[in-house]
């Protein structure tokens, strides 16, 4: 049987609605759902598992999943303790997840609540968002809210913990080349070999500044300063910090480790 040879036999793929979910749903804990456009793997299907998400809803490449996809995911993972939607702050995601949650409440009497992740401090607005963008910081919300749900905490408490994570996470991105969406077939923006784009978005949105290429150590200094010096979080001496260096899906692991070393300096 082909399903016995799967890499993750504990998961199932609902092909009709492009939902990756746990095969067995624990109805006695808060269930967590996230999702978004495809093309950002392992987000979000790679984060479905014990102590993290119960389901991930996969849209087309760089496109939000539809309201019906999210609604079907909510129904498939409905729990006696309720469901928390973890939504990245992009206009399409917010609209479709919100509408799906409202429908599940109205039509199916499912207890649904939501949080909105907006960790990117590069911009206060973009083509895709209302306010700051949700990017790599979403993983911390999956992990910490997932642990709270696994411990049996109720929906208001899981939401409170998730929001506390959101209030204490900030991120910044950069790129040395533009991505090329399959539907477009050409790079979203042009970037000379000697330049890098600071504050680029996960869909290839141009950043806040084009700067000359610098070493990993110099880049880390710029990024850490920008993350530390913002209106989102205020760091002080002695604070403990969890760091994630994210490759946006296109950076070799060796280069991520190089930058991670620079960040930790």
Kindly give the residue locations of the regions a language model identified:
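Glycine-rich oxoanion-binding loops at beta->alpha junctions
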Residues: 40, 49-80, 228
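Short glycine-rich or small-residue beta-strand-to-loop segments that form or flank ligand, phosphate
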Residues: 30-37, 53-56, 82-91, 98-101, ...
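Short, small-residue-biased leader/transition segments that mark boundaries at the very start
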Residues: 2-3
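Short Gly/Thr/Asp-enriched flexible loops that form oxyanion-binding sites at enzyme active sites
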Residues: 94-108, 128, 255-261
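C-terminal non-catalytic interaction/assembly regions of soluble proteins
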Residues: 226, 232-265
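Internal, active-site/partner-interface "lid" segment
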Residues: 123-132, 142-205
